[in-house]
């Protein structure tokens, strides 16, 4: 949306590149939006409006029920029926540390998803500017996960094709929603497919795309370097442009229950 807005006001040159990570812009048959209707959306919006936010645990439950066999019933059997402790898994532990979502943001995202508004030029607006994804011409790097249950990779592929970028690089990682991104080099099980988005059908794209072993991170790093403005010295202190740090790390929010 920001890229489309900058293009509409004549400031697209402020973007050297655009990166979309497990991002669904076309909500048709994808994620939560495909599982609810208008009435259910209004109920969800009303519930978050009462408190002023959507609790992070409630949001995590929504995503868990998109994949109930692995993320719900598996733990019911293991923890409750068999009385075992779940095996430690750092990625899922990090995933459980969810955050709250302001009610206004929740309302906007739900309505945008139910109506699939981003696929319609002018379907949503930003700072008074109608959003048209087709006007986004910035070079784009898109990453999706082949086993992603939240952002299905086919939907990510369709979303990339909504943009007007002349140069797009689509990467399909051999992992799910989180592990597709938390994918450091050196994993012998990791692999990815890569190619342009000229092919209309995502499954045909997958069959023809180049396959590589290991992580996609080095590929992304090289792609960014080609479009960047060289390396810059890291700041010696946090903050800047009139914004000072709020408090020392890790902050107070991480201690809230």
PLM region spans:
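Alpha/beta-hydrolase-fold enzymes
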Residues: 4-108, 225-257
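Short beta-strand/loop motif that positions the catalytic acidic residue
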Residues: 136, 142-144, 148
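Acidic catalytic loop of the alpha/beta-hydrolase fold
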Residues: 147-151, 177-179
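Short alpha-helix in the alpha/beta-hydrolase fold that links the catalytic acid
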Residues: 152-162, 174
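Mobile cap/lid helix-loop segments that gate and shape the active-site cleft of serine hydrolases
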Residues: 95-131, 138
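Catalytic active-site module of serine/aspartate enzymes centered on a nucleophile-bearing elbow/loop
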Residues: 169-257
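Hydrophobic, well-ordered secondary-structure elements that form the walls
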Residues: 110, 159, 220
């Amino acid at each position: 949306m920001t890229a489309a807005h900058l293009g509409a006001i004549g400031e697209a040159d402020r973007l050297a590149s655009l990166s979309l990570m497990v991002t669904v812009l076309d909500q048709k048959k994808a994620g939560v939006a495909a599982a609810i209707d208008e009435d259910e959306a209004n109920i969800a919006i009303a519930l978050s409006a009462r408190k002023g936010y959507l609790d992070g645990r409630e949001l995590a439950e929504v995503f868990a029920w998109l994949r109930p066999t692995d993320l719900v019933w598996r733990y019911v059997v293991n923890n409750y029926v068999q009385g075992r402790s779940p095996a430690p898994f750092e990625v899922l532990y990090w995933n459980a540390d969810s955050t709250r979502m302001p009610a206004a943001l929740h309302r906007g995202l739900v309505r945008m998803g139910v109506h699939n508004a981003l696929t319609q030029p002018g379907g949503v607006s930003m700072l008074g500017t109608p959003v048209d994804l087709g006007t986004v011409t910035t070079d784009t790097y898109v990453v999706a996960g082949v086993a992603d249950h939240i952002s299905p990779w086919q939907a990510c592929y369709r979303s990339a094709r909504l943009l007007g970028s002349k140069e797009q690089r689509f990467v399909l990682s051999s992992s799910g929603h989180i592990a597709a991104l938390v994918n450091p080099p050196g994993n012998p099980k990791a692999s990815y497919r890569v190619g342009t988005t000229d092919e209309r059908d995502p499954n045909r794209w997958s069959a023809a795309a180049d396959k590589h072993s290991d992580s996609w991170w080095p590929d992304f790093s090289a792609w960014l370097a080609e479009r960047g403005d060289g390396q810059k010295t890291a700041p010696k202190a946090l903050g800047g442009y009139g914004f000072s740090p709020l408090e020392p790390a890790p902050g107070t929010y991480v201690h809230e229950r």
